[in-house]
C-alpha cells in the first residue's frame, strides 16, 4: 500500500486499474487515500467460475466481488453477459459499466502464404503427412477445465474419429503442466495424438493448423485461445460454453458451435467443416486491440 501510494503521488496518477477483483481491498484503500479513480477490469465473474468448479467458498468470493465492483468508479467487463449479470446482481450503475473484450494483436488475417509456410513447418516438426488434417488444442493442462477437455478429446472425440478409416488426421496438444499420471500421452502416440507440450511460439500452430477444437464445458468467461485461433483464420469447433463472449454474427463460417456434451455432432463437424473459409473483416473490427483501447479510453473520458 505505502509503496503504491508513494508512486501514485510522485507520478500524479489519476486512475488505477486492477485486474480481477482480488486486489479490490487495496484498490479501494488507494482510491480513498490518494483521491484517484478506481477501475476494475473483470475477466469473468470469478465467483461463478469457481461455482462451476464446485468450490465451497464461491459464495464468499461472490460478496467480495460485489463490494469491489460497487466501490469502483468504472467497471470493464470482457463480455456483455458478464456486464449484464453484474448490473443486475451486483446492483451496478449501467453508465459505469463498459464491455471491453479481450483483444487480438493483428488487424487482419495472416496471408495464405504465411499459413502454408507454418503448416509445412509443423508437418516437418511432427512428421505429419501433408494430406492429414491438423487439429489443435492448447491450454494450461494444470487447469481443471482444460484437463477435462483433454480427457474428452482422448476418450470421446478421438475414438469416433479413429473409427472413420477414410479421415486422415493428427491432433496436436499444446500446453504445460500435464499431470505426471498422463505419462506425456505416450500411450496415445499410435492413436493420432501428438503431445507437443509447452511450445515457444503458439502462433505458429494457430497459423499452420486446420481446425482448432475447443471441447471446454467449465471455467466460465471468454476463451482467449478461441479469439486468437479465429484471428489467425483458423477454423474453430467449440462447445456452447467454450464460445461464450464471441458473437457468432462476426465469425462467418469459421466457428461452429455445438451443444455441450454432444460429441457425436462435434466430431461430425470436424470432418465436414471447410478450413478454406475466411474470417470476416468485422471480426477484427470487434477484437483488434487498437479499436478496443480506443473504446476503453472514451469510456473513461
Residue ranges, per PLM feature:
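Membrane-proximal helix-turn-helix segments that form the acceptor-binding/catalytic region
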Residues: 5, 32, 56-78
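Active-site proximal beta-strand in glycosyltransferases
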Residues: 15, 31-50
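Acidic donor-binding loop of glycosyltransferase active sites
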Residues: 73, 207-221, 234
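Carbohydrate-associated surface elements
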Residues: 81, 100-103
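Conserved catalytic-core segment of nucleotide-activated headgroup transferases in glycan assembly
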Residues: 104-185, 195, 199-200, 260
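Active-site donor-binding acidic/aromatic loop of nucleotide-activated sugar
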Residues: 190-199, 205, 257
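Short hydrophobic beta-strand element within catalytic cores of glycosyltransferases
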Residues: 225-229, 235-240
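A charged, aromatic-enriched C-terminal amphipathic alpha-helix characteristic of glycosyltransferases
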Residues: 275-301
Amino acid at each position: 500500500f505505502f509503496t503504491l501510494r508513494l508512486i501514485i503521488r510522485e507520478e500524479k496518477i489519476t486512475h488505477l486499474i486492477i485486474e480481477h477483483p482480488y486486489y479490490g481491498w487495496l484498490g479501494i484503500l488507494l482510491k480513498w487515500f490518494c483521491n484517484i479513480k478506481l477501475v476494475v477490469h473483470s475477466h469473468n465473474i470469478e465467483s461463478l467460475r469457481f461455482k462451476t468448479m464446485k468450490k465451497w467458498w464461491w459464495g464468499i468470493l461472490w460478496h467480495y466481488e460485489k463490494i469491489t465492483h460497487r466501490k469502483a468508479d468504472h467497471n470493464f467487463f470482457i463480455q456483455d453477459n458478464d456486464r449484464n449479470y453484474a448490473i443486475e446482481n451486483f446492483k451496478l450503475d449501467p453508465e459505469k459499466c463498459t464491455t471491453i473484450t479481450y483483444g487480438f494483436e493483428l488487424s487482419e488475417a495472416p496471408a495464405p502464404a504465411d499459413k502454408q509456410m507454418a503448416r509445412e513447418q509443423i508437418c516437418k516438426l511432427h512428421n505429419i503427412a501433408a494430406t492429414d488434417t491438423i487439429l489443435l488444442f492448447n491450454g494450461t493442462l494444470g487447469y481443471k477445465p482444460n484437463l477435462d477437455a483433454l480427457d474428452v478429446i482422448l476418450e470421446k472425440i478421438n475414438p469416433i474419429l479413429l473409427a472413420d478409416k477414410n479421415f486422415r488426421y493428427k491432433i496436436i496438444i499444446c500446453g504445460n503442466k500435464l499431470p505426471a499420471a498422463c505419462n506425456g500421452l505416450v500411450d496415445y502416440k499410435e492413436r493420432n495424438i501428438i503431445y507437443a507440450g509447452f511450445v515457444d511460439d503458439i502462433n505458429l500452430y494457430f497459423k499452420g493448423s486446420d481446425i482448432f477444437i475447443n471441447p471446454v464445458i467449465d471455467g466460465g468467461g471468454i476463451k482467449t485461445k478461441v479469439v486468437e485461433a479465429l484471428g489467425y483464420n483458423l477454423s474453430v469447433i467449440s462447445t456452447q460454453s467454450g464460445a461464450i463472449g464471441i458473437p457468432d454474427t462476426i465469425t462467418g463460417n469459421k466457428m461452429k458451435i455445438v451443444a455441450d456434451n454432444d460429441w457425436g455432432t462435434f466430431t461430425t463437424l470436424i470432418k465436414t467443416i471447410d478450413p478454406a473459409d475466411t474470417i470476416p473483416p468485422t471480426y477484427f473490427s470487434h477484437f483488434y486491440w487498437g479499436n478496443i483501447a480506443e473504446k476503453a479510453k472514451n469510456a473513461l473520458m
